[in-house]
UniProtKB/Swiss-Prot annotation:
SUPFAM superfamilies noted in UniProt: Carbamoyl phosphate synthetase, large subunit connection domain (SSF48108), Glutathione synthetase ATP-binding domain-like (SSF56059), Methylglyoxal synthase-like (SSF52335), PreATP-grasp domain (SSF52440)
Sequence positions that bind Mn(2+) 4: E834, N836
Pathway field: Amino-acid biosynthesis; L-arginine biosynthesis; carbamoyl phosphate from bicarbonate: step 1/1; Pyrimidine metabolism; UMP biosynthesis via de novo pathway; (S)-dihydroorotate from bicarbonate: step 1/3
Protein name: Carbamoyl phosphate synthase large chain
Length: 1066
């Protein structure tokens, strides 16, 4: 079937801000699909509220709306742009849910707009738990015994009939939101209440728990003519019971017999045909070990996290092909871009093994429960490729950037064999390392399998790795032993650790005496049956090299930013991709190194060459030895890339742009203080310390409050405000849980207004696209603050000082490329608090809203061009004639036990944008995009720390004027009443009813404003109240500045008045 020529203008719905369960994979899929549609001459209209994405760049779609992802806003866009079709399958659950609301309300029919890529019936059959169950029964596909419920008592009745444990799966939710495994009635009531609240249709599936069965996934494609293929099948190392996004996943499956593989493949093709899917689809199965019994767990009728993994694992561009199918093409009409010779109807074949390991945020949320269940907790993931499973696992583990280089991780020296046996029962992020320790202690693979239900094949492979550790410790390091260890991807540093040699000795022995070098193989979709046209490589130690490293033009190495995590998100991938594109245009051969399967940077056609490798010195050196690049770019890949600077210089690779010494000078307290003194720039007083005692002395000399933080970190990791000696002791203990190579900084904390700039510098001139102002006062991490462009409340004098200081600092640090500076404005004085001579998380946002492509300009500066010649002027750019507000988005509901109080350590996972002609409308849009929906009941809770009580009076007065009923803790209520604001006093957690907890559990409250005292004590009432508000779905604000901003937007804007701005036309 050729293309459907009636499709001329398509609205693509994006996935919105990054939250746990919905990360960069949808930017990758959406970008690929928009490019695929434009290739076919289709006009593409895009709506997505996330400014950090590549897909919201003005040249990816024809019209780009960075607007809140709500049904009402999408309706407005359809009425304005009049697309003939809507493609909702590339924006994850958010896009599917909006499409269903527009279809069910009759809006799409009224406007003559068609859904393409899927139908509402297809979405319903896959997403509605009752429809799905009925469809599976109709075609004879087995599901676990289950019932669909819309009330908690119905769930309890079913569970008591079939017995606990049971699994709760809400309909139309993402990343297992609201789901879980309940071991008893109390847990069931808790999980099911939450699940029904989060489900778009108030529906949950309660099913018999089959935890312990193998979890298998099939990624399938089907076209409109009914042709189907399986792109990839994947096996979760973790059995059923852990969300697939939190599981270690292996592709292709390793433990299935051919009969099992074919049985599930046939089932997947039957299901996709019955549900009538056109495009990509993911089917998840539970397979009972040692039998042919299986159950269908669920079907995702859209591009998903698993499709991104399958795409990168096989080289098959699922999103691109899905977009072509949506236009009417059949699989045999779509060429395979990797081989250039085959078509999309050829099933990929793999002659290597791929391992994905999730990246969890437990280093940021040390109080959060680490237990893994059916509700996802990972923020990102890493992928590795090798010719064997052991090698792929070892590569994936070191890609996580947690100082883990082998299976020998974690201190178990104080644990007895019995303790280790107990730890095997814990299902958390450390389980594979506990398995390795259990093997070392002589616990049999059979017993480990019995406890964990992880397949013996995987346990045996981990045993092979622990056996190699033993051999390296006990045997002489012969060439044969070294080669065997390298084939399992043991890094030189681990071989050195076990063999008692130094790293340099091992490296010299391997490279010079034994001549053992990494070889690179191609990912080609067809197990080398046809030659690949696109250069996409992975390393191994047991084969011929397949890379053509001949030099035709200058080569530049672009280092990516690794897995998505809090503090280092999709923004840095955005910067890496734009730097790569810019350098390619400047005539360089570009080489990307990265290991994140969700991102645009690891797509096969972004750079001239892609190396899917861990970002460690040894792995990068293997590439450098082969490619001999003329230079490397580290300033676009976040802290991951910056940390490789020293290693690259040792390899003889020049760092393009700002030199390593100047990056160090910005991080080194003493060197940086000298620069500030020379430039006559003030900063808050501070000291460097190494021990807790030194920190307490420094804090007392500076005077409380102080800021305590490690140096060389991203996202404010480990940063806290201390108000007394006990706080300093607690924070130092937490910081020192990780070995600190650098001193710890103690700074005087100033309660001023925080202002931020990103600038481009060529060594002489600077260009500042705009000045951004934070709504929250200093002390809340810039990534968690609401950011406003252009700054609204700074004077011209302060603005001039900021530009002057930026120019002086950029010149003193000899910045070539990007620099990010954070200032505090306190009593009209400007202080510098932080300087980062690299890209920052605000770069995509400021680029889009000012229409100044600063990554591209910085890349040109890095290559020697002058800013004055690039057509955007120098100094501070002219202000835009609209306001853009970047709003942080959090994923607290997925992390039970995490404190949501904001402070200097970053906690947000994503962001959205509000853009409008007026400040009030932009602010309202930003809150709307972040999912802060108010009001339903017009009832709120106000409880603030003593220091905030007087300021809380005006907040209470404004809420009262909006018609809110205020409940307040006794001390807060007393201050409000004394100042003429009526409030109902209530107890916090204990005491006479109704307490604050009772009010929250009664689902009558719209909003909680609770400003926390310092510290991480989980037993404090404030902590309990903040957690309960998140778990009952109530918006909770922990800063009065945020509360005032919300009030401003509520006082000034009604929903019907929202305007739309196409940023491609700015």
């Amino acid at each position: 079937m050729p293309k459907n020529n009636n499709i001329k203008k398509v609205l693509v719905i994006g996935s919105g801000p990054i939250v746990i369960g919905q990360a960069a994979e949808f930017d990758y899929a959406g970008t690929q699909a928009c490019r695929s549609l434009k290739e076919e001459g289709v006009t593409v209209v895009l709506v997505n509220s996330n400014p950090a994405t590549i897909m919201t760049d003005k040249d990816i779609a024809d019209m780009v709306y960075i607007e809140p992802l709500t049904p009402d806003v999408v309706k407005k866009i359809i009425l304005k742009e009049k697309p003939d079709s809507v493609l909702p399958t590339l924006g994850g659950q958010a896009a599917l849910n909006i499409a269903m609301e527009l279809e069910e309300s009759g809006f799409l029919a009224e406007t003559g707009t068609k859904l393409i890529g899927t139908t509402s019936l297809t979405i319903k059959k896959a997403e509605d738990r009752l429809e799905f169950k009925n469809t599976m029964e109709k075609i004879g596909e087995p599901c676990a015994a289950s019932v669909v419920v819309t009330t908690v008592p119905a769930a309890v009745d079913f569970a008591e009939t079939i017995g606990y444990p049971v699994v709760i799966r809400p309909a139309y939710t993402l990343g297992g939101s609201g789901g879980g495994i309940a071991a008893d009635k109390e847990e069931l009531i808790d999980i099911c209440t939450n699940g029904l609240r989060l489900s778009r249709v108030g529906q949950c599936l309660i099913e018999r728990c089959i935890a312990g069965w193998k979890e298998i996934e099939y990624e399938v494609m089907r076209d409109g003519a009914g042709n189907c293929i399986t792109v990839c099948n994947m096996e979760n190392l973790d059995p059923v019971g852990v969300h697939t996004g939190d599981s270690i996943v292996v592709a292709p499956s390793q433990t299935l017999s051919d009969k099992e593989y074919q049985m599930l493949r046939t089932s997947a093709l039957n299901i996709i045909t019955e549900i009538n899917i056109t495009g990509g689809c993911n089917v998840q199965y539970a397979l009972k070990p040692d039998s042919f019994e299986y159950c269908v767990i669920e079907v995702n009728p859209r591009v998903s996290r698993s499709s991104a993994l399958a795409s990168k694992a096989t080289g098959y561009p699922i999103a691109k092909v899905a977009a072509k199918i949506a236009l009417g093409y059949t699989l045999d009409e779509i060429p395979n871009a990797i081989t250039g010779k085959t078509v999309a109807s050829f099933e990929p074949a793999l002659d290597y093994c791929v391992v994905k390991i999730p990246k969890w945020p437990f280093d940021k949320f040390i109080m959060a429960k680490r237990t893994l269940t059916t509700q996802m907790k990972a923020t990102g993931e890493v992928m590795s490729i090798c010719t064997n499973f052991e090698g792929a696992l070892m590569k994936a583990v070191r890609s996580l950037e947690q100082n883990i280089y082998s299976m020998n991780y974690g201190d178990y020296s104080k644990d007895s064999v019995e303790d280790i046996r107990e730890k095997l029962h814990l299902i958390d992020d450390r389980r594979i390392f506990v398995i390795a320790e259990a093997i070392r202690r002589g616990i049999t693979p059979e017993e480990i399998n019995d406890i964990t239900k992880i397949d013996l094949w995987f346990i045996d492979k981990i045993a092979i790795l622990t056996e190699m550790e033993k051999r390296l410790s006990e045997e002489p390091l012969t060439k044969e032993l070294m080669l065997e260890a390298k084939r399992m991807e043991f890094p030189d540093r681990v071989i050195a650790q076990f063999s008692g040699k130094t790293l340099e000795e091992v490296k010299k022995l391997r490279k010079e005496e034994y001549e053992i070098h990494a070889a690179f193989k191609t990912v080609d979709t067809c197990a080398a049956e046809f030659e690949a046209q696109t250069p996409y490589y992975y390393s191994c130690f047991d084969s011929e090299n397949e890379v053509d490293a001949t030099k035709t033009k200058k080569k530049v190495l672009v280092l990516g930013s690794g897995p998505i995590r809090i503090g280092q998100g999709i923004e840095f991938d955005y910067c890496s991709v734009h730097a790569t594109w810019s350098m390619s245009k400047s005539g360089f051969e570009t080489i990307i190194v990265n290991n994140n399967p969700e991102t645009v940077s690891t797509d096969f056609d972004i750079a001239d060459k892609l190396y899917f490798e861990p970002l460690t010195p040894e792995d990068v050196e293997n590439i450098v030895d082969l490619e001999q690049p003329d230079g490397a770019v580290v300033q676009f890949g976040g802290q991951t890339a910056i940390k490789l600077t020293e290693a690259l210089l040792k390899m003889g690779v020049p760092i393009l742009g700002t030199s390593a010494e100047n990056v160090d000078a910005a991080e080194d307290r003493e060197l940086f203080d000298e620069i500030l003194e020379k430039c006559c720039i003030p900063r808050p007083a501070g000291k460097t310390v190494f021990t807790t005692e030194e920190a307490i002395v420094a804090a007392n000399q500076l005077g409380y409050p102080v800021l305590v933080r490690p140096s060389y970190v991203l996202g404010g990791a480990g940063m806290q405000i201390a108000i007394c000696d006990d706080d300093v002791r607690e924070f130092m203990e937490i910081i020192n849980r990780n070995v600190q190579e650098h001193p710890i900084l103690v700074d005087k904390y100033l309660m001023g207004k925080e202002v931020e700039v990103d600038a481009v510098c060529d060594g002489e001139d600077i260009l500042i696209p705009g000045i951004m102002e934070h709504i929250e006062r200093a002390g809340i991490h810039s990534g968690d603050s609401i950011s406003v462009y252009p700054a609204q409340s700074i004077s011209n004098k302060v603005q001039d000082v900021i530009v002057d200081y930026t120019r002086k600092l950029a010149k003193s640090l000899n910045v070539i490329g990007l620099i990010n500076i954070q200032f505090i404005v306190y009593n009209e004085e400007v202080y510098v608090i932080e300087v980062n001579p690299r890209s920052s998380r605000t770069v995509p946002y400021i680029s889009k809203v000012t229409n100044i492509p600063i990554v591209s300009l910085a890349s040109k500066a890095v290559l020697g061009e002058k800013i004055a010649d690039l057509g955007y002027g120098t100094g501070l750019a002219k202000k835009a004639d609209y306001i853009a507000i970047k709003m942080p988005v959090f994923s607290f509901e997925k992390l039970r036990g995490a404190d949501i109080g904001l402070g200097p350590e970053m906690k947000s996972t994503g962001e959205c944008l509000g853009i409008a002609k007026t400040f009030n409308e932009a602010l309202y849009k930003a809150f709307l995009g972040a999912g802060i929906n108010l009001p339903k009941h017009k009832k709120m809770i106000l409880t603030v720390k003593d220091a905030d009580k007087l300021e809380a009076v005006s907040v209470g007065r404004r809420f009262k004027a909006l018609g809110y009923e205020i409940y307040a803790t006794r001390s807060t209520a007393r201050v409000l009443k004394e100042n003429g604001v009526d409030a109902i006093p209530v107890q916090k957690v204990d005491g006479e009813s109704p307490t604050i907890l009772d009010l929250l559990l009664g689902h009558e409250i719209d909003l909680v404003v609770d400003t926390p005292t310092q510290g991480r004590d989980k037993s404090r009432d404030g902590f309990v109240i903040r957690r309960m508000s998140i778990e009952t779905g109530v918006t909770c604000l922990t800063s009065l500045d945020t509360a005032n901003a919300l009030l401003t937007s509520l006082e000034n804007v009604a929903d019907g008045e929202l305007s739309l701005i196409d940023i491609a036309r700015i």
